[in-house]
Curated annotation (Swiss-Prot):
Record carries keyword NADP: no
UniProt organism field: Streptococcus thermophilus (strain ATCC BAA-491 / LMD-9)
Function: The heterodimer acts as both an ATP-dependent DNA helicase and an ATP-dependent, dual-direction single-stranded exonuclease. Recognizes the chi site generating a DNA molecule suitable for the initiation of homologous recombination. This subunit has 5' -> 3' nuclease activity but not helicase activity.
Superkingdom: Bacteria
A GO MF term: double-stranded DNA binding
UniProt keyword annotations, A-Z: ATP-binding, DNA damage, DNA repair, DNA-binding, Exonuclease, Helicase, Hydrolase, Nuclease, Nucleotide-binding
Cofactor(s) needed by this chain: Mg(2+)
Source species taxonomy: Bacteria, Bacillati, Bacillota, Bacilli, Lactobacillales
Broadest EC class assigned to this enzyme: hydrolase
Family stated for the protein in its record: Belongs to the helicase family. AddB/RexB type 2 subfamily.
Subunit structure: Heterodimer of AddA and RexB.
Matching NCBIfam families: rexB_recomb (TIGR02774)
Record-given protein name: ATP-dependent helicase/deoxyribonuclease subunit B
Amino acid sequence: MKLLYTDMSQDLTEILTEQASSYAQKGKRVFYIAPSALSFEKERKVLEYLPQSASFDITVTRFTQMARYFILNTSNPKTQLDDTGLAMIFYKVLLHMGDDELKVYGRLRKDSNFINQLVDLYKELQQANMTVLDLQHLNQVEKQEDLVRIFSAAQDLLLAGDFDNQSKLSAFFKEITSGHLDEALSNTVLVIDGFTRFSAEEEALVALLNDKCHQIVVGTYTSQKAYKANFVYGNVYQASVDFLRTLAQTYKVIPDYVTTDKEGNRSFARISRLLESRHDFSTVDETVTEQDKHALKVWEVVNQKEEVAQVAKSIRQLLADGKRYKDILVLLGDEESYKLHVGQIFRKFDIPYYFGKEESMSSHPLVEFVDSLERIKRYNYRAEDLLNLVKSGLYGGFAQEDLDLFEYYVNFADIKGRHKFLSDFTANSRDKYNLDQINALRSQLIEPLDKFLNSRKQKGSSLLKKLVVFLEAVQLPSQMFELSTKASEAEKEQNEQVWKAFTHILEQVETIFGDESLSVDDFLSILRSGMLACDYRTVPATVDVVNVKKYDLIQPHSAPYVFALGMTQSHFPKVGQNKSLLSDEERSRINEATDEHRRLDIVTQINSKRGHFVAMSLFNAASEQLVLSQPQIINESQDDMSVYLKELLDLGIPLVEKGRNRFEAKGDQIGNYRDLLSTVIALNSSHLDLDLDKETQTFWSVAVRYLRKRLDKDQVLIPKVIDDVTTTKVDDQVMQLVFPEEEPLKLSATALTTFYNNQYLYFLRYVLELEELESIHPDARHHGTYLHRVFERVMGDSSSESFDDKLEKAIAQTNQDQPFEILYTEDQESRFSRQILEDIARSTASVLRDNAAVKVEREEVKFDLLLANSIKITGIIDRVDRLTDGALGVVDYKTGKNVFDIQKFYNGLSPQLVTYLEALRQTYKVDADQLFGAMYLHMQVPQLNLAQIGLEKLAAQAHKELTYKGLFVSSETEHLTGGNYDLQKTVTYDKEDLETLLDYNIKLFRSAAEVIRSGNFAINPYTEDGKSVQGDQIKSITHFEADRHMGQARKLLRLPKKGKKEAYLELMAKTEEENQMQVSENTISFPVIDHAVRVDKKDQEDNHVD
């Protein structure tokens, strides 16, 4: 064995390539061994350094692949299993074990994560040259017994099924030991590069090959100073020094320090020496130079998006300077959080890149198909799982319109569970749904699915056949073909890989579970676990791309230009964590009890020295320039600076703040056309003249003209970011169809409230007639109708029975009404809602029972009022009461808390009670002095705070809560005193005030009708304070944003509380000429006010449909 080491300023791969080439010239077969994750990059570099750029005698590979070259022709009839196959073996083993057989892991028998941990431990034991019997000294004896039982059963199953149960290196090891390869190995030379440690399996193999091979050359990076030091703990080269010293001691070899004639980058060499001296507590007579500051830069950026954008701009500048994409390497501290940003921004900058990370197949439609299939069975036909299956694009050739109809109905009827999906759908809403069509669709969707999922427990081979029949019935193969015909080349390749993985899993299921009795649940669970564990294999489309990968795989001299992103404390250095079934303490005790070349890795013990070596490799990764960048905000949280970056700053490397001046007009900051375009769009053009000098203004003016020409040439339309949300006039033909001119405009109190809430909300509901998603479950509307019906029956019962008996009879009769019986017996939740409603009816009824001074005149009174032959006001009054003096009043039942607020009324948001009084006045042909008021009766159980109310006052306070609240005529209050009426001064009005309210209410209707007839509906939700919006913004449709569009909101007129009623009445009483409401496109002005107003909530207080 020959051991070589060199400084990181030297290129070790070049040195080892010369060694390999010299042995090849002597007729030796050379294997150049690199770590698995680096074999591709090593092969490329070795080929570059070979004098002839290629050699048949030198093979760049990894340990496991090298073994195949020697044992490829060796007969091995055993079936090979990959990780998915091993997982199936463990699944089968655990399937035959009961919970009581495994004392620690009994509850995890079918947990896919636990099975994956078993697979990882199985492979780790192979790499450690151990068996499960070596797992002694665990924290729990029961844990050891469980693992021995599981692994022993798995080993028996592998042997019984004639599966290959050893790794490639183990098979190679056996062939070497047998002596069959002595002749071939005697002419073989191994050159090992890129390692700072061997696994136990690799270590044993190297020891064996050292006696058989012609030569083994091992090279690594360290300094002479570090290797010769007596104390290396904490040294930046501790990992490689320990590695070298162990090999030197084992094989009695003195390592040689080697160099080349080529001098590396002096700046990186100097920085490496300075860092080394900081960690070995020595001093060097060197300082950082200006050249060093140019070669190594430390950036600080606000966030990840800006960080990637700055790197992209620098890459575009390097290209402008004549560099190639392949000369640039981008390293990531956290791959997952940067993947999306890198993809989006590099595409914007037209930078081709290769992300060297396997991508999960989990988002592919076929994987979603299998996942949904398993979840449907596991959760007994949960609606969301079944809808995901049929909407995967691979389930039958159904039209999208049919699938949308099916989904809409399932959500409406709340279909859950196998029984409901197999039964005919019967629920309907005003005959809105074509049940024959929907049930025919249900049969086509559910029948083939249920036929497969309802299969009894049987052999795996039989279930596979039934699965194939099911897949053909739902046309999965043809749908996959159809999916590929519309796909891009990259997507076609992905589809091919997914299909290959799917069929491979089915083959392994046939092999392992063919004769095993399986339930459909277990069968689908196996398929799902296998598919979710699959990854896409990615290969760069061309060599000339920017390589992107995680930084901890970096090697010195990887590329001329290197950008390392996300170098924060959390990710640089990376701290390895133990996530296996064995703790660090257990691993340590096992290692102490085993002999040489048998060892479990303890990741946490090597974190420090591994972190130092990776950092030094990163600092020497570039041959020209290295940029280390850290964002202040990463993964939406603030992170501190890495200790390694702090060390660089202490050495004198300056911290460069990037992205502070995003719109600086420098040629080397533009990058490319798309970036310039996005920058111009982002600029606020109204501030250009204020913020930029004349020269910069000229630059941007020219740039904008250039961009406009490019946009026109390429026919590119840029979505505008608008600061207002405007609407266009509704077509006259549409208005004539919805609101014919020859007919009066129909309005109700609810429609009027909607209009003054937000004009556009009225347009959606009453012009387009859009509806919210319905549900078969009762809601506030149904609850209100139920209580209406109860009280209607109670008040209409003229029998001699007691009031309480009448009430109970009314509740029983209402419960038996077919609509309510269906609604309130659907499930436990519905029955509970009915129970609450019955309690509310009994609580509220006490108000009706004690109201002797009032006689119920009529109930459910429909009215149509005609205003000037142009407006028809419609509605239903819940109850009309008559006092003993003949005065009439209105009662409206409410399930929520409502009061008459004159401020809301003035602003058009509470016209209901006044509208009902107008209906009484015109229907009964009475004057205002013959009305006693309009009020709400809140149908609810009083809720009292027992901490604030004593028991002696509890009954009185509860009774007080059950009162009529609204507006009352002051002259009639003497007849109401002592009853359940809230007669505060602020809600009592004399005859003249009531006339004012009635007249102003008509003005509200007329003003609204004028706007509606015009066809101009503004997006103007109301605001009470001008700072926040209370009206319905309908954001998903209008894109209204309070912070940007507050100017279009309708601001309500708010007056001080003192004298509020009188002030509003005075405003209403002004002559119509002085107080005419002017309704424009964006504002609705009210008397003596000219503000904009807005709305955000649909007023659903009216519990019946007008």
